[in-house]
Amino acid sequence: CGLISKPVDLPENMRLLIQRVKNASVSVGGVELSRIGQGLLVLVGVGVEDTDEDMEYLAGKLVRLRIFDDEQGVMNLDVRQVGGEVLVVSQFTLQASTRKGNRPSYVRAAPEAVSRPMYERFTARVAELLGREVPTGEFGADMQVALVNDGPVTIWIDSKMRDC
């Protein structure tokens, strides 16, 4: 592994945008589909080159991510340790590239035939690791996501940017 010495566009990779929340919900057409209390809102973008290995890595990283405060106010606890919930929402725009011009390109986003099953496997794996159901949005729908950030704490995890 080497250090990246200049900004680069990464390969088509699975990306998570994780927000620590007091609460969050997702609706479609004014109808609430899912709601959580304290926990994590996770936006998931699947890239064209993603594998089950990428999905496994991110699911494990997500549930072990220590971004909740312990008794000393130090971010030292994971979502399981605080009894938190996880809301997973698909978001292909996490795969946007803005290198050329001002209009985002989504050619790095996996097509639905690839991304939907990967998203579903990711959500199922997170539920398995948490030992509880994981609420979701509606894949491919125009959703409205409401949240109250806690901190705010927002973390970006990329499946191709792993420790060696």
Q: What is each stretch, according to the model?
A:
Residues 1-13:
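N-terminal amphipathic/basic-hydrophobic helices that include classical n-h-c signal peptides
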Residues 31-83, 94-124, 129, 135:
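Compact, glycine-rich, soluble single-domain proteins
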Residues 108-109, 150-164:
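Short, low-complexity, polybasic intrinsically disordered segments
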Residues 135-152:
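Short, active-site-adjacent segments that bind or coordinate small-molecule cofactors and metal centers
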Residues 22, 63, 123, 127-131, ...:
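Signal for well-folded cores of large energy- and translation-related assemblies
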